[in-house]
């Protein structure tokens, strides 16, 4: 069994965002197939870990990102542990990763969740050109890079001339391996909890709401999509909004309670809501947005209506009729797609072959 060290630069347990959930589930399933040790921050609840060893070495404060004392500490851990490879989540610690490799010779992988500079450029950060240079340098030096999306991988290969032999797919995974049989039961449970009529369509939006791309998507629902839906006099529906971090200025969406909007806040079991939903709404127009939630929604049987930006990164060929895409800002077309969703269409089996965690880890092990 391979001995693998992984470094997560921020707290991910318990998880609240899609990125945190990705790391948590990736490590959980990787730990089942390798001898895994994870170094992360003191702010994690490692009592939730069951398949790997954890070391809370990184500081809680932002100074952890430039803590030069980590060079000696992680070098010692690598040498004493006899690890075969190290996986660094995100490129932020590239300066540290290659100093550790120089001292130990360990095979070094970067796990990138986005082309980071593009994400920060899209949200207006002035320093994106600096990050672009740093990120490109990081990719050039890595022994291997794991990409969430085929688009990101092709960008690195075509634009930054990264050797394709060093580029590997690592999509966001789902724990289920088949279309759920309990969707009706889950719908009834959610409907009872939120006083939803049996005749109502259930539309769902889920995401960390203090993340600007998600907040902008929520505003698109409130200001554009919902008003268009409400014009259809024969449509009975409710839109459930899930997620923590809603700004106080929106007052828990109380002003929209009489407009078919239900604010559920953070929910412990989001899979219940995915199974209950007829349609998941993904009107994201910048940044990373809700891509991870989109994969989960389709896995649990909901149909997703997404903008082009929102749908970027998902393997559309395996989604069948469970993914409908419109252009960004095309709210009339977006609304028409919602209205034209065919109820009851199953998720294709090919979707689970690609996105089930056990299948993902099986392929990933070959590259370590």
Model-flagged regions — what are they?
Residues 293-296, 303-307:
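Short hydrophobic beta-strand element within catalytic cores of glycosyltransferases
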Residues 151, 173:
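Carbohydrate-associated surface elements
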């Amino acid at each position: 069994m391979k001995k693998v060290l992984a470094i997560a630069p921020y707290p991910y347990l318990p998880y609240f965002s899609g990125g945190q959930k990705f790391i948590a589930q990736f490590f959980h399933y990787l730990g089942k197939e390798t001898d895994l040790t994870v170094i992360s921050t003191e702010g994690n609840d490692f009592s939730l870990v069951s398949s790997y060893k954890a070391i809370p070495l990184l500081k809680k404060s932002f100074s952890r990102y430039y803590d030069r004392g980590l060079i000696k500490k992680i070098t010692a851990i690598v040498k004493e542990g006899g690890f075969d490879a190290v996986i660094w989540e995100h490129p932020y610690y590239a300066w540290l990763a290659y100093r550790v490799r120089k001292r130990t010779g360990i095979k070094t992988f970067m796990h990138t969740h986005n082309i980071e500079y593009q994400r920060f450029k899209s949200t207006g950060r002035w320093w994106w050109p600096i990050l672009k240079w740093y990120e490109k340098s990081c990719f050039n030096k890595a022994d291997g890079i794991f990409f969430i999306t085929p688009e990101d991988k092709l960008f690195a290969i075509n634009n930054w001339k990264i050797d394709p032999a060093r580029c590997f797919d690592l999509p966001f995974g789902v724990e289920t391996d088949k279309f759920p049989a309990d969707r009706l039961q889950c719908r009834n449970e959610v409907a009872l909890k939120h006083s939803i009529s049996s005749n109502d369509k259930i539309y769902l939006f889920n995401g960390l709401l203090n993340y600007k791309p998600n907040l902008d998507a929520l505003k698109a629902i409130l200001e554009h999509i919902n008003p268009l839906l409400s014009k259809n006099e024969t449509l009975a529906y409710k839109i459930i909004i899930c997620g923590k971090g809603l700004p106080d200025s929106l007052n828990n969406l109380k002003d929209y309670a009489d407009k078919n909007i239900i604010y559920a806040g953070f929910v412990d079991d989001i899979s219940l809501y995915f199974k209950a939903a007829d349609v998941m709404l993904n009107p994201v127009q910048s940044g990373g947005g809700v891509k991870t939630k989109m994969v989960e929604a389709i896995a649990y049987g909901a149909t997703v209506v997404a903008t082009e930006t929102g749908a970027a990164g998902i393997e559309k060929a395996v989604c069948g009729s469970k993914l409908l895409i419109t252009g960004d800002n095309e709210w009339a077309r977006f609304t028409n797609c919602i209205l034209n969703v065919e109820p009851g269409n199953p998720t294709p089996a090919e979707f689970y072959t690609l996105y089930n965690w056990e299948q993902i880890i099986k392929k990933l092990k070959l590259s370590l």
